[in-house]
Swiss-Prot record:
A zinc finger (C4-type) spans 7-37. GO terms for molecular function: rRNA binding; structural constituent of ribosome; zinc ion binding. Keywords: Metal-binding, Ribonucleoprotein, Ribosomal protein, RNA-binding, rRNA-binding, Zinc, Zinc-finger. This is Large ribosomal subunit protein eL24. Part of the 50S ribosomal subunit. Forms a cluster with proteins L3 and L14. Zn(2+) binds at residues 7, 10, 33, 37. GO terms for cellular component: ribonucleoprotein complex; ribosome. The keyword Lipoprotein does not apply. The gene is rpl24e. GO terms for biological process: translation. Binds to the 23S rRNA. Belongs to the eukaryotic ribosomal protein eL24 family. Pfam families: Ribosomal_L24e.
Length: 67
């Protein structure tokens, strides 16, 4: 059984055979679940500032802010 990948940008798990794998020149492997995540990563957007990412939700819990 194939292993599910986790998006390097939003943190969402996605099925094998979908998404995109990007290998940087230093050998680090990045997985993207969608074109949206890939585009935001290369534009330099901070995932902690976008509400739909797992990084935002974890940072919000660490700050203790609840709405």
């Amino acid at each position: 059984m194939a292993r599910w990948n986790v998006c390097s940008y939003c943190g969402k798990p996605f099925e094998p055979g979908t998404g995109k794998m990007f290998v940087r020149n230093d050998g680090r492997v990045l997985f993207f679940c969608s074109r949206k995540c890939e585009r935001y990563y290369f534009m330099g957007r901070n995932p902690r500032k976008l509400k739909w990412t797992k990084a935002y939700q974890e940072a919000r819990l660490q700050r203790g802010i609840r709405k």
